[in-house]
UniProtKB/Swiss-Prot annotation:
Any one biological process term the GO annotation gives: regulation of arginine biosynthetic process
Gene that encodes the chain: argR
Name of this protein: Arginine repressor
Source species, domain of life: Bacteria
One MF annotation (Gene Ontology) recorded for this entry: DNA-binding transcription factor activity
Length: 156
């Protein structure tokens, strides 16, 4: 006979499932938890767990609305150090792209615009979590990239 799973197992599995960022409804989460062996789970309990852990719905990489946890989301707060809001910095021959926590791109872009041309930044365009940086000169894009990375203590 199989031992029943503990509440700690449920919490661990619940968090693991939300990290997958592919569940857009509570019923999908119920089904996934039942598949993991939690037969006594229902929509009401999932709803309470979502509230308890502060889960929110946001868009994943495929632009689907899914549930995720705040720790995975990295929601900016007034006390968030700016370096914690920058998730990735990359570039090609013409542009630098900065990925941020959801909702942080406008704040980071405003900072980048304020340092501007002296640091090699002609301008920025920001969405919710992505910033396109147009360098003053594509010939010095590596220098501008390093400036942006050092500004946020970002290391590859």
């Amino acid at each position: 006979m199989q031992a029943t799973k503990s509440p700690d197992d449920l919490v661990k599995t619940f968090k693991s499932i939300l990290k997958e960022e592919r569940f857009g409804s509570q019923s999908e989460i119920v089904t996934a938890l039942q598949a993991e062996g939690f037969s006594n789970i229902n929509q009401s309990k999932v709803s309470r767990m979502l509230s308890k852990f502060g889960a929110v719905r946001t868009r994943n990489a495929k632009q689907e609305m899914v549930y995720c946890l705040p720790a995975e989301l990295g929601v900016p707060t007034a006390g968030s150090p700016l370096k914690n809001l920058v998730l990735d910095v990359d570039h090609n021959q013409a542009m630098i792209v900065v990925r941020t926590s959801p909702g942080a791109a406008q704040l980071i872009a405003r900072l980048l615009d304020s340092i501007g041309k002296p640091e090699g930044i002609l301008g920025t365009i920001a969405g919710d979590d992505t910033i396109f940086i147009c360098p003053s000169s594509i010939h010095n894009i590596e220098d501008t990239l390093e400036t942006v990375k050092s500004l946020f203590n970002y290391a590859d």
